[in-house]
């Protein structure tokens, strides 16, 4: 199983980029959720169940997808100089 790295950028299999802010736990069920921010548009904050965030792309539904996982960690150099 993959490990989520906080404060790192992930690419969604449909192409957009997101910053993982934290892992949150549901107060009633204890289920874990990934808290992530859109790096486009309004930069809003979103949550998704951890197991869904780490799931593989359904290649039957998306046969042309090049990613193996729904979200994949990106190695992005600093953009501070740009």
PLM segments and residue spans:
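Mixed-charge, low-complexity intrinsically disordered regions
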Residues: 1-82
């Amino acid at each position: 199983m993959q490990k989520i790295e906080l404060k790192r950028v992930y690419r969604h299999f449909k192409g957009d980029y997101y910053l993982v802010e934290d892992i949150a736990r549901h107060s009633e069920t204890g289920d874990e959720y990934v808290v992530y921010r859109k790096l486009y548009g309004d930069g809003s904050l979103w949550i998704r169940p951890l197991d869904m965030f780490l799931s593989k792309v359904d290649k039957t539904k998306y046969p042309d997808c090049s990613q193996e996982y729904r979200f994949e960690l990106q190695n992005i150099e600093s953009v501070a100089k740009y």
